[in-house]
Amino acid sequence: MTNYNFSAGPGVLPTPVLTKIKNEFIKNEFTHMSIIEISHRSTQFEEIINSAEERLRDLMNISDDYGVAFIQGGGSTQFEMLPLNFANNKNRIAVLDSGNFASKAAQAAVTIGKQATILDSSKVDHYHHLPMLSTDFNADEYDYLHLTTNNTIEGATYHQSILPKTVGRLTADMSSNILAEPYDVNDFDAIFAGAQKNLGPAGVTVAIVKKDWLKEQNIENVGSMLRYQNYLDKHSMYNTPPVFSIYALNLVLEWVQEQGGVDSMYAQNIEKSSKLYDYLDNSTFYHALVDESARSLTNVVFTTADLERDQAIAKDATKEGLFNLSGHRSVGGFRASLYNAQPIEAVDALITFLKKAENNYK
């Protein structure tokens, strides 16, 4: 029996990457020691971190107008780091509340003394649709507009085609769909993504920031560890970076390139998610929760509308080698995470199981 991991994060990693990590963990042919033992000042690690940045720039078409940094602390640290660095003119940000992580970004800004205005929220229907900008939105009133491209918990996504159009600054949390579908980086002024969903293991967060915007900021009262400029100036080595996480990230980026890049990943993710959504939409037992136009490619959320039954089915799934299918505690139901490394066979196995469960519980 093949086991499949549907966890929302840390998420599934490509098997070739895991195999390479296993083979090189004790002794790498270039470092002659374990990757977790090498110095972050060594030429070997310099090659690794340079490669990771080059691969990411290549995959996302990131121009030299943007700086790329690899930072510790996860997306939660970015919730505070972003307004500390960029909300220093009006001390006010705008947020589209599309889910738990968008809401947390707003709360974090308030915690550090900034104003956070919720322009629109889809909380009223449990985030099953996406909040959008109104026609009277005035970007001049805010330092920037923040959104979450993919809402990991609730399963709704701002795809490139439905991104809100603003003449102001736009920032995004792309933690759970970075490299899963194409985005034009030039539409954003800052992007961050925790690696543990679609880029690699936990421990490193990617930050992509527009250099000219950063230079405009007065950050003299911002702690040194929370300044993007320090990471850019020191090539992500302002302090000891997460060596292993960046090493693994580089391997994942290499794997994505070998698969044909983001466009190839996008096509595969459409195929995987469409197959599952089609099954759910044609079932009278299961129900996909998100409006069709906003459905996530990477986090498919659904339910039978019976909490105890959902829990029983998720428990049964583990016996069939299908792990971590339970939805987030705030939503319930099921969540099947179909990140880049998730094979189509996992979706086939899931659908086969769901049909079996329907017969058993209907």
UniProtKB/Swiss-Prot annotation:
Catalytic reactions of this protein: O-phospho-L-serine + 2-oxoglutarate = 3-phosphooxypyruvate + L-glutamate; 4-(phosphooxy)-L-threonine + 2-oxoglutarate = (R)-3-hydroxy-2-oxo-4-phosphooxybutanoate + L-glutamate
Alphabetized UniProt keyword annotations: Amino-acid biosynthesis, Aminotransferase, Cytoplasm, Pyridoxal phosphate, Serine biosynthesis, Transferase
Required cofactor(s): pyridoxal 5'-phosphate
Enzyme Commission code(s) on record: 2.6.1.52
Pfam families, sorted: Aminotran_5 (PF00266)
Residues that coordinate or bind L-glutamate: R41
GO terms assigned for molecular function: O-phospho-L-serine:2-oxoglutarate aminotransferase activity; pyridoxal phosphate binding
UniProt modified residues of type N6-(pyridoxal phosphate)lysine: K197
Subcellular location: Cytoplasm
Superkingdom of the organism of origin: Bacteria
Binding site for pyridoxal 5'-phosphate: G75, S76, F101, T152, D173, Q196, N239, T240
Gene3D superfamilies associated with the record: Aspartate Aminotransferase, domain 1, Type I PLP-dependent aspartate aminotransferase-like (Major domain)
InterPro entries: Aminotrans_V_dom (IPR000192), Aminotrans_V_PyrdxlP_BS (IPR020578), Pser_aminoTfrase (IPR022278), PyrdxlP-dep_Trfase (IPR015424), PyrdxlP-dep_Trfase_major (IPR015421), PyrdxlP-dep_Trfase_small (IPR015422)
Pathway, per record: Amino-acid biosynthesis; L-serine biosynthesis; L-serine from 3-phospho-D-glycerate: step 2/3
EC class name: transferase
Predominant cellular place of this UniProt entry's protein: cytoplasm
GO CC, alphabetical: cytoplasm
NCBIfam families in UniProt: PRK05355.1 (NF003764)
Family assignment from sequence similarity: Belongs to the class-V pyridoxal-phosphate-dependent aminotransferase family. SerC subfamily.
Self-association and partners: Homodimer.
PANTHER family referenced in this protein's UniProt entry, alphabetically: PHOSPHOSERINE AMINOTRANSFERASE
Functional description taken from the UniProt entry: Catalyzes the reversible conversion of 3-phosphohydroxypyruvate to phosphoserine and of 3-hydroxy-2-oxo-4-phosphonooxybutanoate to phosphohydroxythreonine.
Name recorded for this polypeptide: Phosphoserine aminotransferase
Organism, scientific name: Leuconostoc mesenteroides subsp. mesenteroides (strain ATCC 8293 / DSM 20343 / BCRC 11652 / CCM 1803 / JCM 6124 / NCDO 523 / NBRC 100496 / NCIMB 8023 / NCTC 12954 / NRRL B-1118 / 37Y)
